[in-house]
Amino acid sequence: KADGPCRTVTAGFLIGSDGANSVVRDGIGVSWVDLGFEEDWLVVDFKPHDPEMEIDMPGAGQYCDPERPVSTFRWLGRSHSRVEFMLLPGETAEQMTAESRCWELLSRWKITPDNATIIRRTVYTFQSKLADQWRRDRVLLIGDAAHLMPPFMGQGMCSGIRDAANLGWKLDLVLSGRAEATLLDSYTEERRPHVETVIELSMELGRIVCISDPALAAERDESFRSGRAPTLPEFPSLTEGFLHRAIDGQPTAAAGTLSVQPRVCYQGRTALLDDIIGSGWTLMSRVPIHRLELSPSHSSFLSALGVRTLHITQAEVAEAVIDIDADVTRWLDGLDSDVVLVRPDFYVYGIAWRSDAGALVESLRQQLEPHLIKTSV
């Protein structure tokens, strides 16, 4: 337990990003909703004495072995590796974390004390949980403080980054005096159902990997060999919150999907688009911005919201962003549109033809307006 001096800090908001055993979550009385996955796995991190040592394991792999399911990660950074072993019935954390036992398990890949050093050995319980609330007044939860998932899709930290990106742009509007705190209600609305779907996908992969019954494992293997195994659904898009919507309320084409990350050139600098434009809302168009049918009030709204407007083209046009590899061109061709409005968290708000750009901006204004402070935006 912490035994250092106490300090009092005053802030507008408190973000609990303090992990699965979150003190912040417990402090505001938020409970877990258990989605029903729980397996103990031994995690062993090791460092080869020679970083270039040949090890016969995939860069990232799942061994669906009923005798003991295993996950391997050849490279963690430039010099470390990781192997994870599922605990079998009757095995304890104390037994499995014994150094001699870890070397015994690693010997499968000819990893020994002579050629490597174990730097960590611990047992984790892989779980699937969601906090029942992500916001209570001026306290919000992100990352493992808000959700836990099995690691089989590698989406735990990714989901936490999505949380931060989603909450960040909304907090910016609130703290800069442009929006009311009601805007923050959309954080839970948008992120919770998305991460719940990701957890369910991770659980499904975990169920495939963690089979230890030989007969069931044989059935699984045959279903893959024969092609009868069902495919996993596509990675989820955003479906709730601030998205361009059709008359029936459903997101329009591309709304809620992730934007592209092309190589571009702007004012003599070549880089990825995000490095050129920075953070914030972005209106990208393959026709010059002045040719879009935007009213003065729409232009004023975009300016107050801090929206960056970009003309992106393959031609070398003054003040335009050059689409070096035609990634944006192909993307917009596939979307059958000229214009795309991208949120600060890089999700697409909506797309439009140049003649409908004003309607696209107007729909965003109508969605945000109930939360905006009138004198600011």
Predicted ranges, named:
Residues 1-221, 310, 351, 377:
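Core Rossmann-like FAD-binding/catalytic domain of the broad FAD-dependent monooxygenase superfamily
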Residues 104, 173-377:
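Helical substrate-recognition/capping region of FAD-dependent monooxygenase/halogenase enzymes
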